């Protein structure tokens, strides 16, 4: 290789890699529902979004086990304390942890091996709001879970404002995969979710059809009621 001739290319490649690993990813969170959604993010906090409003958060590279979700039928006081019917996070407007099921999740891990982000929509914590999770440019797949799951929810999974995942209700290995890899598989109740939202996790070990990748450095859009 002629090093001097290829130096500009090498510098450009280094700059792209450096940017992906050192710059936060931006998440544009949008409420297109006809009702108010109290958006939540871990990390990130939380904010009330009326119809048509949006909220931008920046997430540091290398962040893992992160999620964004919506809360419904909330009531907070001037100090940001209260409660929500679904997705509540310890009674706080600005969440400091995960939400209480049921809640539809946009999950992600940024800047993982091979310069990839791992992204998914999950119904493992149940379903409360239709959700889209997509890149802001066409660099990877658009994920959507937009079925009338609350209205069609099986009776044993129904709860005010949402539809529980069977793991939440029964808390057994059959539904929660608590005995480790390969210890559980699809069930009739998990298939209820999968048939309506093929892109989304329906049980904890649903990785082959539910976990997707995007290039590190991608920015994202999360839409309630796409």
Swiss-Prot record:
Enzyme Commission number(s) of this protein: 3.2.1.-
Organ and tissue specificity: Expressed in fruits.
GO cellular component: a single term: extracellular region
Highest rank taxon of the organism: Eukaryota
Class of this enzyme: hydrolase
Disulfide bonds, paired cysteine numbers: 33-225, 74-84, 89-95, 140-214, 145-197, 153-163, 167-176, 177-184
Subcellular location, principal: secreted
Cellular location(s): Secreted
Entries under PANTHER family matching the protein: OS03G0233200 PROTEIN (PTHR31048)
Protein name from the UniProt record: Thaumatin-like protein
Organism encoding this protein: Olea europaea
């Amino acid at each position: 290789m002629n090093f001097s001739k290829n130096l500009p290319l090498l510098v450009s490649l280094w700059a792209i890699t450096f940017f992906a690993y050192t710059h936060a990813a931006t998440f544009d969170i949008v409420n297109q529902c006809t009702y108010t959604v109290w958006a939540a993010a871990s990390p990130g906090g939380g904010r009330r979004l009326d119809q048509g409003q949006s909220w931008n958060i920046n997430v540091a590279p290398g962040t893992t086990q992160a999620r964004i979700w919506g809360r419904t039928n909330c009531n907070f006081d001037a100090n940001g304390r209260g409660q929500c019917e679904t997705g509540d996070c310890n009674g706080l407007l600005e969440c400091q942890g995960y939400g209480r099921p049921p809640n539809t999740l946009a999950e992600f891990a940024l800047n993982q091996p091979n310069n990839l982000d791992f992204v998914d929509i999950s119904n493992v914590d149940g379903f409360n709001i239709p959700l889209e999770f997509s890149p802001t440019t066409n660099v990877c797949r658009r994920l959507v879970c937009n079925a009338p799951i609350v209205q069609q929810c099986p009776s044993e999974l129904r709860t005010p404002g949402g539809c529980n995942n069977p793991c939440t209700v029964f808390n057994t290995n059959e539904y929660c995969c608590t005995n480790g890899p390969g210890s559980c598989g699809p069930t009739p109740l998990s298939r209820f979710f999968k048939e309506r939202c093929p892109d989304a996790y329906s049980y904890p070990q649903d990785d082959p059809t539910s976990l997707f990748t995007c290039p590190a450095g991608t920015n994202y859009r999360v839409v309630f009621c796409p």
